[in-house]
Amino acid sequence: MSRILVAAALALAVGSVGTTWAQTQSTAPTTDAGTKLNFPATLGGATFERVVNYAAPPANRADLGSSYFYSTPQKMVITVQVFDGGRRVPPGSTSPVVIGEFTNELDSVGQQIQGSGYTNFQRPAVPSSCTYGSVTFRCITYSAITQANMRVYSKLLLTGYQQHFVKIRIDWGQSPQVQHTSADADAALQAFIPALFR
């Protein structure tokens, strides 16, 4: 995958909670304290890259939890953010709390894409439900064109689990050299998510 594509995917991956590079990071695999979800060195074929703890300085935002970054053998980026948003989160994907947070996430994505110099932001008008293993999420796939004239895609998933939000996003791109599809992303998620919730 070209460096431009990797940079574009990483830009989308870090966008939803601000600049993660300035936060406390670690490359050591870990277990999330609130949900007991385990983030090992390899998960469903994807390789652990790093964890960002937003509760630590300089952010000091415990409500934003932590983000765990993985890369797939196909060079797609999977990000898992576990957070509570400062409230108790009901289980599943259909509660008003989860629906409201999903709407907020989509609004934030739209604003960040506009501010990033990307163009031609596309997303369905209505999100859907996606089930991976035994877990159902609210989900949507969106895309935009980078300044390098490459279309990049993200699939955003959100559910409530153990009184926390679990937000998963997979990012991929299409260029003359790389032709990932939504089927490739779904195959990666079908391996990754059941392993995460095991």
Per-region residue spans from a language model:
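Positively charged n-region of N-terminal signal peptides that target proteins for export
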Residues: 1-4
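Surface-exposed amphipathic alpha-helical segments
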Residues: 167-198
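Sec/Tat signal peptide C-region and signal peptidase I cleavage site
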Residues: 18-22
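Signature of long, low-cysteine stretches enriched in small and polar/charged residues
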Residues: 111-156
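N-terminal "mature-domain start" segment
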Residues: 23-74
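Short, surface-exposed beta-strand/loop micro-motifs that present aromatic residues
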Residues: 68-69, 152-161
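A short acidic-to-branched-hydrophobic micro-motif
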Residues: 65-104
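Bacterial N-terminal signal peptides
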Residues: 7-16
